[in-house]
């Protein structure tokens, strides 16, 4: 099928290119995560932790306050392990400079009761350790609102997903009487997380310290996975696609290049070389994964809305490679769902070409057994038997 050719006019050769993007930052260092002002994070006694949980629960389910929102972060820092001893999982002190840190007690207004009677009633049958462990678990679950809408959290609470996860994870009964979702309180918490630097700075201390957590299962389940790679679907889609089709990093980057996305692929290459390829450890906290929470200009070219075609190609590869489920289909990414039908068809065909190259062509170069273009056996009528009947010879095309 012939296509018309574009004739470029010299009159437009000196025009300044418009990309729709502002100049963004191409890197992020771990120290930036702990450089922001924060509320003071400290080890709480059991008695103080119980009070902090009650303040947090009052703010989430009864009446919101800046003090209660800060309590969510304080209790996340005081999360407990699932074993009977219930020891703290975060270090005693965060790594940030504490000269400008704010004491949460400064948020308390004299004469205001920060603990509601309903909260006292709902937790009264639980032991102190149960209150602390369950309260911190719920508090940590709200941190996803730093990157995602509060409606996702309220729906999870209404369907008892969070309560069930606590029971399953801790192998014990959920200890509180039922709290009814308060959408207004959840929305206020979401807006505070999204818009106020002190809360974000406190989150930064928590995320930096994830590398010090011996058993990260709770943190990964409750907020790590939800906050990582904010708005950058290209990163998990790329790594999943590489795993799915067995491509080299250079091979997949090359296959994805169509010229206009070269800058995106070069930024991805830079991120792979400087951060993604390095194992986490004391000298690599991998906080780049959360950078866009604190500075939206970081890795801007990797934001999905600026590289939708590339993400769509990768998502289609993963869909073909079955690295998706009914509930986590990569093609359900909002930006991809909004693409025009023609664009969806085009990117899917490109994905098929890439998938075919690495799954058939590249393998066939090393072993004829994988050359399914050249050698094909006739399938049985029910299409469940992919082996030729005895005595048959392969059909060459």
Swiss-Prot record:
Keyword Ribonucleoprotein: yes
Signal peptide: none
InterPro entries xrefs: Rhabdo_ncap_2 (IPR004902)
Recorded GO MF terms: RNA binding
Pfam families in UniProt: Rhabdo_ncap_2
GO cellular component: helical viral capsid; host cell cytoplasm; ribonucleoprotein complex; viral nucleocapsid
Record keywords: Capsid protein, Helical capsid protein, Host cytoplasm, Ribonucleoprotein, RNA-binding, Viral nucleoprotein, Virion
TM segment ranges: none
Main localization category: virion
Subcellular localization, as worded in the UniProt entry: Virion; Host cytoplasm
The keyword RNA-binding is assigned to this record: yes
Function: Encapsidates the genome, protecting it from nucleases. The encapsidated genomic RNA is termed the nucleocapsid (NC) and serves as template for viral transcription and replication.
Subunit field text: Homomultimerizes to form the nucleocapsid. Binds to viral genomic RNA.
Official protein name in the record: Nucleoprotein
Organism: Lettuce big-vein associated virus (isolate Japan/Kagawa)
